[in-house]
A protein has these predicted regions:
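Helix-rich "cap/lid" substructures immediately adjacent to catalytic or cofactor-binding pockets
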Residues: 1-38
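Non-catalytic peripheral regions of patatin-like phospholipases
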Residues: 2-7, 57-103, 121-141, 160-165, ...
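Conserved small-residue
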Residues: 14, 24, 44, 118, ...
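Catalytic nucleophile loop
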Residues: 35-53
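A short alpha-helix-loop-beta-strand transition element characteristic
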Residues: 104-117
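Short pre-active-site segment immediately N-terminal to redox-active cysteine/selenocysteine motifs
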Residues: 295-296, 339
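Iron-sulfur cluster-binding cysteine motifs and their immediate structural context
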Residues: 302-318, 335-352
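Short linker/helix segments within small regulatory modules
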Residues: 320-334
């Protein structure tokens, strides 16, 4: 990507893992890449709005690395004790409100440079509402950001103009689909949600941890469905390696920021992988070889349901067979692999396979 290439930066949600976005912005700015606009969901909206509102990277890092659990997540003990199932949320709203006030203040959307769009959902209608778009920019940025961070069950819905809004991740956790209405320029999307096929021991984290993991699975599945047929504008997808961190963990704050910085610098170094003018779809694209380990296959047919049409068939022994082993994948392809209950589907980079054959 050239320095003069216009692009929209999309920052997805992911709880504390979203601190990686600070490193992402730092890497882009250091290399002279300034987005023409930012679209954010949840923590992505918070980081994007704070930076666009004039807060420097150094100050953002300082706040992020100094965060403690009580600064964001304070259990609403009184509501849980007295209101029980009618409690509005697990956590109090005040700590999050204070954090947003520290980073965003009383800014209006007109004061943000570059412009920022904040992804939310109307709780009662289910409609995606992107604050900051024309006609939706007459509220405080802090109100939009709180609503975007209000993951249902964890934080109470936020009232704006008599209606109640929650985290936009309910509909689109990495909302680059919202960029489609803003023009044909390149989209750089950053996904910090769980991307590991296996996430260990989620069942041991209590009901909040179990619900958080279930939410991650839901958001990832929704995202895959929304982008399966994506064409334009072209998207370059960056996935910092933070899948081992839970949404509510405060044990890896520095690592998350640094990983966002590393992943973005690494992506910018691979200039040959970035889409050219006129390209479509999601990038980077890489050749992979897909195979099925027959001894593991139980013939359940899940791969026929979740894989691309015609890619798998069952042979006479009800073993899955790959009809098109050589695939071109974007980061959003291959999700069907995790739907194999015996983990019999294997994908390897095509160049890795060729090197193994040469060395053998």
């Amino acid at each position: 990507m050239n320095r003069d290439t216009p692009f929209t930066l999309v920052l997805g949600g992911g709880g504390m893992k979203g601190l990686a976005h600070i490193g992402v912005i730092q890497a882009l700015v250091e290399r002279g890449h300034r987005p023409t606009r930012i679209i954010g969901s949840s923590v992505g909206a918070l980081v994007g709005a704070a930076w666009a509102g004039g807060m420097g990277i150094a100050r953002l890092r300082e706040i992020a690395l100094g965060l403690r659990r009580k600064d964001v997540f304070a259990v609403a003990h009184a509501d849980m004790a007295f209101k029980r199932m009618r409690s509005p949320a697990l956590f109090k709203r005040e700590p999050l409100e204070h954090l947003i006030a520290r980073t965003v203040g009383d800014l209006t959307f007109q004061q943000l440079d570059p412009p920022v769009v904040v992804n939310t959902v109307d709780l009662n209608s289910g409609m995606q509402v992107c604050w900051g778009l024309p006609g939706l920019d007459d509220i405080r940025v802090a109100d939009a950001v709180f609503a975007s961070c209000a993951l249902p069950g964890y934080f109470p819905p936020h009232e704006i103009g008599g209606r109640f809004y929650v985290d936009g991740a309910v509909v689109s956790n990495v909302p680059f689909d919202a960029a489609r209405a803003l023009g044909p320029e390149l989209i750089v999307a950053v996904d910090v949600s769980a991307s590991s096929v296996l996430t260990a021991d989620a069942q041991d984290e209590g009901f909040a941890g179990v619900f958080a993991r279930a939410t991650e699975i839901l958001m990832e599945t929704l995202l895959e469905q929304r982008v399966r047929t994506w064409t334009t504008p072209a998207v370059y997808y960056i996935q910092p390696r933070v899948e081992h961190v839970t949404m509510f963990s405060f044990d890896h704050l520095r690592e998350e920021v640094e990983e966002g910085y590393r992943a973005t610098n690494a992506a910018l170094e691979r200039s040959d992988e970035w889409p050219e003018p006129g390209d479509v779809g999601i990038h980077p694209k890489r050749r992979v070889l897909v195979r099925v380990e027959r001894e593991r296959c139980i013939g359940c047919g899940n791969c026929l349901v979740h894989g691309p049409q015609g890619m798998f068939v069952l042979d006479s022994e009800r073993k899955a067979v790959v009809t098109q082993p050589d695939q071109e994948w974007s980061p959003m392809d291959g999700g069907y692999i995790r739907h194999c209950p015996t983990y019999a589907i294997i994908a390897r980079p095509a160049d890795q396979k060729r090197e193994m054959m040469k060395s053998g």
